Design a protein with these regions (language model features):
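C-terminal motif of bacterial Sec signal peptides marking the signal peptidase cleavage site
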Residues: 3-6
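Bacterial signal peptide processing site
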Residues: 8-11
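First exposed extracellular module after export/assembly in secreted or surface-exposed proteins
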Residues: 15-135
Length: 135
């Protein structure tokens, strides 16, 4: 699930989307029980971030333990395809992650990037580490 907030006009930002890691919670997650919540901020000068086609994914989260990529869809953020600068936050939820080795706890972090309708790929940000523990 992805939630978003705020749009503003600013001519000093790039048409290539830019993202910034804000937070990841909880710091310790129970395996298969606790959801992992990540917040990133975004800016995009021409407002073409997001897509209304339900078959197009444009937000990607890579689990650095095993290379599994979670794919999300950001809905179109500007009304009627207007070219306006936008900025805000995305809340990303990863449901109940598991331990991928034979230990009783494991650290994990994620790499995240977005793409826009113009084919521009944002910078990639890395989250801080959290620990997943057996229940």
């Amino acid at each position: 699930m992805v939630l978003l907030f705020s749009c503003t006009k600013d001519d000093t930002i790039s048409v290539v989307p830019t993202i910034e890691f804000k937070s990841i919670t909880p710091s310790i997650a129970q395996e298969y029980i606790d959801d992992i919540n990540i917040i990133i901020s975004y800016t995009d000068a021409d407002g073409d971030l997001g897509e209304n086609n339900p078959d197009v994914y444009n937000l990607f989260v890579l689990d650095n333990r095993n290379g599994i990529e979670y794919k999300f869809r950001i809905p179109e953020l500007t009304p009627n395809g207007n070219e306006i600068a936008i900025e805000g936050n995305f809340n990303i939820k990863i449901n109940g992650s598991g331990i991928t080795n034979s230990s009783t706890s494991q650290q994990v972090n994620y790499d995240i990037y977005v793409t826009d309708r113009g084919g521009n790929v944002s910078n990639t940000v890395s989250t801080s580490y959290i620990t997943i523990e057996e229940e």
